Amino acid sequence: MEFILSLVGSLLLIICVLVSVAFLTLLERKVLGYIQIRKGPNKVGLMGIPQPFCDAIKLFTKEQTYPLLSNYLSYYISPIFSLFLSLFVWMCMPFFVKLYSFNLGGLFFLCCTSLGVYTVMVAGWSSNSNYALLGGLRAVAQTISYEVSLALIGFKILLFSFL
């Protein structure tokens, strides 16, 4: 029973995160509209509130294109895997109601964020374009260099929290 409750809680958490990101993009579009002295998205529904759902429907009904010489499966799986990794990071966040009890939540966070490097590298490699591969390798080098400083800052906070 506890497993089912934690599964439902994590599913609810993921849905809430995705919906909140959709409404944050709506807020961003509204703010950019007011900066440019216009209303922003307000044509759909009441004050444009259903606009993120319309954008999602439009996104899922678009034609799927891919490079002709690409590795089709890895070209599409790597962004999906990256999305799943970023959603898994939310599982180790300390909430008021504990979904999962992690003894090593910080290590899980570092592992999930560092696995995102491989998705960028696989996406660049699977397109079979030299420019995409170079861009992917550049992003990998940047991400790895930032992860080292993130890990050192996290360990310093962890070390000084026990003093």
Swiss-Prot record:
GO biological process: aerobic respiration
Listed transmembrane segments: 3-23, 77-97, 104-124, 143-163
Transmembrane found in the keyword field: yes
Topology within the bilayer: Multi-pass membrane protein
Enzyme class, UniProt record, top EC level: translocase
Stated name of the protein: NADH-ubiquinone oxidoreductase chain 1
One GO MF term: NADH dehydrogenase (ubiquinone) activity
Pfam families with a match to the protein in the record: NADHdh
Main location: mitochondrion
Gene behind this protein: mt:ND1
Keywords per UniProt: Electron transport, Membrane, Mitochondrion, Mitochondrion inner membrane, NAD, Respiratory chain, Translocase, Transmembrane, Transmembrane helix, Transport, Ubiquinone
